[in-house]
């Protein structure tokens, strides 16, 4: 009976934002404050189908791709059950997406994980959180590669790339610094 209605998909973004392969990672890397799931009909072009409902959650400062995926999975499981009967009974309306507002969440490349200390501290933390656990954000120091698992904003000010204290605190491009919590 659902086949007659078309195929349904639950996409891990608030469409039309972040169509594509890596919506969770891209939303975190781009410092979004909210994300969610969209229940949509499948169309030939990727993630362009009409949407019947979208459900939002906040992205907290300590969230990463893993925690957001868990939250969105639970939200999707709950909300699809609320929508199936309405879809079958034609009690729910699917609305076309505004394609002019679409953004694309390209597949993540491992090379995107390399930290550029001239970026803002917030962007670097977004990259660390967005790429956790895989493929991961990393930096090269004295020829060695270090994968960064967790970091937070710190209060030190220094030159770009300068280590500022007895724990690892690195100054970034916007004269703010990050505290590396876990490598």
Briefly describe each language-model feature range.
Residues 106-119:
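Acyl-group handling in specialized metabolite and lipid biosynthesis
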Residues 33-36, 47-48, 53, 109-111, ...:
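A generic structural signal for well-ordered coil/turn residues at beta-strand boundaries
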Residues 1-104:
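Donor/substrate-binding cores of folate-linked one-carbon enzymes
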Residues 118-183:
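An anion-binding loop in the catalytic cleft
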Residues 19, 107-110, 127, 145:
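Basic side chains
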Residues 29, 43, 105-107, 138, ...:
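Short secondary-structure boundary/capping segments
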